[in-house]
Regions:
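Terminal alpha-helical segments
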Residues: 1-123
Length: 123
């Protein structure tokens, strides 16, 4: 799943580079973080149910390793409502290009952190 997370991150970056709509960039950044978190939980044989909620996934990872709380402090979990709600009409949410750029950076930070945790577990 970590490979898929990096793929979604690369997609978000490419979409940013070609000037795609900010909401679709944020969506792929959120998906990247979600897949990385789920990869960590799978590695630890933790059930997470059917959820896309980053706040919940970070909490589940924090039960294994308290350092995951840093992701809450960095507001990584805020990608979830931004990515999900902005995809639907009439929500009143409009994402700016600056928010899309920030989403990519947050995804990079989160995936790098999670990848280090996965590698340390495997070694």
């Amino acid at each position: 799943m970590v490979e898929e997370a990096y793929t979604d991150l690369r997609v978000a970056v490419k979409l940013f580079e070609i000037g795609e709509e900010p909401w679709v960039i944020v969506f792929h950044a959120q998906q990247a973080v979600e897949k990385a978190l789920k990869a960590y939980l799978v590695l630890h044989n933790r059930h997470f149910g059917k959820t896309h909620n980053l706040f919940r996934l970070i909490d589940l990872c924090s039960e294994i390793d308290q350092e995951f709380q840093q992701l809450h402090e960095l507001e990584i979990d805020k990608l979830y409502p931004l990515a999900i709600e902005a995809r639907y009409p009439d929500t009143g949410i409009e994402i700016t290009i600056d928010e899309a750029k920030e989403a990519i950076e947050k995804a990079r930070i989160a995936i790098s952190f999670i990848t280090r945790k996965i590698k340390s577990k495997k070694s």
